[in-house]
Amino acid sequence: MTDAPAQIVELARSRPRADGAPVVVGITGAVASGKSTFAAEVATAAGTATDVVSTDGFLYPNAELEARGLIAHKGFPESYDVDRLRVFVDEVHSGAPMVMVPQYSHELYDVGGEVPLTLRDDAMVIVEGVNTLGALADQLELGVYLDAAEEDLERWYVTRFLALCAEAENDAASFYRQFTAMTVSEIESLARQTWRSVNLVNLRDHIAPTRALADCVVTKGPDHDIVAIEVR
């Protein structure tokens, strides 16, 4: 299989844009599909002047989700500040020398704080998240969808959930600390229940339909190996 990250970089840089304007690449896919890892690989292939931004930072804070009655739908489209996300991409495209990026902590399970992002000439900004194409398809130079079988996605999610719970044994501030008194079997059962009642629903109802908006579909096999690349 052709080096997928390098192919994504080549495709993105071939897209029309104003001279010197940053290239914005969107990467989406289900929870646990490996978006962050793939985005990091694309950034490495692109070299310097490349940054990765997660849409998780554009989630509403937990307190606001609670107030709106949306905490059970965290990660669904309505739980994101899409206007703020779109303004961010506009600022990147505008040639601004610096933009602010809101941050998210998976350990704390909440947003918090911002960090500055310095944009250099011919920069590439990779925006990754479950809602990237749904929110930004018309603003991207290149939209990428990471595809995988549902049974593989569930297995990857459970593995990640178990790992986060194990790490929480030594981190009292971690959101996952609350599960550490449970047995591994109980944690795995909880993870599968969460996948099927929340993440699978989000995938089928909101994420998978955005596959049609992608310029490129990268299909993964059971071991996160890339088995196909479809360029549209």
What kind of region is each of these model predictions?
Residues 43-52:
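Post-Walker A helix-loop "phosphate-sensing" segment adjacent to the P-loop in P-loop NTPases
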Residues 51-54, 60-111, 124:
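Conserved nucleotide-sensing/catalytic segment adjacent to the nucleotide-binding pocket
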Residues 35:
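Conserved lysine of the Walker
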Residues 38:
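Hydrophobic positions on the alpha1 helix immediately C-terminal to the Walker A/P-loop
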